[in-house]
Swiss-Prot record:
Keywords: ATP-binding, Cytoplasm, DNA damage, DNA recombination, DNA repair, DNA-binding, Nucleotide-binding, SOS response. The keyword ATP-binding applies. This is Protein RecA. Can catalyze the hydrolysis of ATP in the presence of single-stranded DNA, the ATP-dependent uptake of single-stranded DNA by duplex DNA, and the ATP-dependent hybridization of homologous single-stranded DNAs. It interacts with LexA causing its activation and leading to its autocatalytic cleavage. It comes from the Bacteria. One of its GO terms (molecular function) is damaged DNA binding. ATP binds at residues 67-74. Gene3D superfamilies: P-loop containing nucleotide triphosphate hydrolases. GO terms for biological process: DNA recombination; DNA repair; SOS response. Belongs to the RecA family. SMART domains: AAA. One of its GO terms (cellular component) is cytosol.
Length: 351
């Protein structure tokens, strides 16, 4: 074995050659610099941000949101888009289903005038557009809605009844191999919305599976299973859904956490309702009968009145949200974010 000084000289020479050929920082020691905090995009639900363990969806990673129809998948994705735009970011939406409702998106806070939208004809076209947008280095978040609608060109141009086994899975595998590195380099979050299917002949375990093969399961840093569990009513009228999100996979924090939040028809995720739920759960908000109080002041009688009070007092809502996240140790502290994160990619707790 070579002497230690000789080995170190050989390593230094190799590192110098790598830096010269591939650019400075191509290889680094983990201890060389203090690592910047994980940069995130808030989801719009404080319960989901806490369940994710880092305060939102991580930048530079692949995220999969899946579940049954009308469970709130696109709503969660659009809230992430709106929050990225509030941070000054640029967002794109690949509408493979041709079903994006601009009016609904605007109600959720999305700047539809600035949102980049594509309605591709084939899966190849959709993924090529996505690859080019990510490669520009200008995007903060891109949503693909949905994986199931990424139909390969051969299937579209073929006849009904033709067999195209594995085409979509191969397409997804190739695309993810190409984009994963670029996402990390450009700090772009890619959100894939996916649908559920049932496997035939499964007698043990869940028969449910997602479309597009196994590649997305492997490449995704976070997978969120979104389900509608209850209909919210005011009198006889249905006003929204109670939604449960399970973090099925999480490379950034412990997985399998569960979050519940309300989605109000025409308004999206009830941020204020989530703050009240989490505040009560962690002792910041007191509930006595139907009354909710914070620091001796009454928020309102009943959930709807308390929601409305927080909506009319955004400073109080932001303070409660900050206190909840601080108590649970979730999100980036402002001083750390200012010191270590770049202005464009700075994590934001409030929105």
């Amino acid at each position: 074995m070579a002497a230690a000084p000789d080995r170190q000289k050989a390593l230094d020479a190799a590192l110098a050659q790598i830096d010269k050929q591939f650019g400075k920082g191509s290889v680094m020691r983990l201890g060389d610099e203090v690592r910047a905090p994980i940069e995130v995009i808030p989801t719009g639900s404080i319960a989901l941000d806490v369940a994710l363990g880092i305060g939102g969806l991580p930048r530079g990673r692949v995220v999969e949101i899946y579940g049954p129809e009308s469970s709130g998948k696109t709503t969660v994705a659009l809230h992430a888009v709106a929050n990225a735009q509030r941070q000054g970011g640029i967002a794109a939406f690949i509408d493979a289903e041709h079903a994006l409702d601009p009016e609904y998106a605007a109600k959720l806070g999305v700047d539809t005038d600035a949102l980049l939208v594509s309605q591709p004809d084939t899966g190849e076209q959709a993924l090529e557009i996505m690859d080019m947008l990510i490669g520009s280095g200008s995007l903060d978040v891109i949503v693909i809605d949905s994986v199931a609608a990424l139909v390969p060109r051969a299937e579209i141009e073929g006849d009904m009844g033709d067999s195209h086994v594995g085409l979509q899975a191969r397409l997804m595998s190739q695309a993810l191999r190409k984009i994963t590195g670029r996402l990390s380099q450009t700090k772009t979050t890619a959100i894939f919305i996916n649908q559920l299917r049932e496997k035939i002949g499964v007698f043990f375990g869940s028969p449910e599976t997602t479309t597009g093969g196994k590649a997305l399961k492997f490449y995704a840093s976070i997978r969120i299973d979104v389900r509608r569990i209850q209909t919210l009513k005011e009198g006889a009228d249905s006003v929204g859904n109670r939604t449960k999100a399970k973090i099925v996979k999480n490379k950034m924090a412990p997985p399998f956490k569960i979050a519940e939040f309300d989605i109000i028809y025409g308004q999206g995720i009830s941020r204020e309702g989530g703050i009240i739920d989490m505040g009560v759960e962690h002792g910041l908000i007191k509930k006595s009968g139907s009354w909710f109080t914070y620091d001796g002041d009454q928020l309102g009688q009943g959930m709807e009145n308390s929601r409305r009070f927080l909506r009319d007092n955004p400073e109080l809502a932001a303070e409660l949200e900050r206190l909840i996240k601080e108590k649970l140790g979730v999100g980036v502290k402002p001083a750390e974010a200012e010191k270590e994160a770049s202005p464009k990619l700075k994590a934001v707790d409030g929105f």
